[in-house]
């Protein structure tokens, strides 16, 4: 069984580049707080734009698409979904809205994770909405010639619930350590979530929702105004390269979190 342990974030051996980046982000957050009060109308408009971009981009990463006009209509509740892809888009909208409006009341635990997944998958009538996978899954990579290979084998279905419980406990333990920087902890937790791959479908989109949830809960709400998901989609080759490098050796506790942390 994979061991979830984030104590390495408090061993004084973190790369200076990561320390410098987090320092800059904290400084920018302080500046943003002042701008919000001075330019409230601008931030309201940015939030509206970013919400559409987030819903569009997070789904586009998974090949779920429709026209920009239809996405805007769905996000703004001015039109109902017309097909399966649009139902998936509506589901992400609903889960994202849940985080935007109620993140203070959503803890990082099994109840919240299953609720977000159920909210996201219910509009598309997924029979496993809000439920962990029932069969083992693999992450397959297809090269330019159409050849497939197994890139990663996630946690087996019968070990998923226990793995998710251990992930939650490890996160809570790390949160109680005042010497662990939350900005560095969050990408580690998200990487582990992706490697567990607890659901039959929707793991990638869930990882982005959980990223936003944890960022918001720790006072980093830039994702409300500049789409976090759009940035991943824009640089997805770099994102997937970092994910692949950081997931190598994960099942034997030999992986390196730093590439994914740096990308995050």
Could you say what each language-model-derived stretch is?
Residues 1-264:
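FIC/Doc superfamily catalytic core
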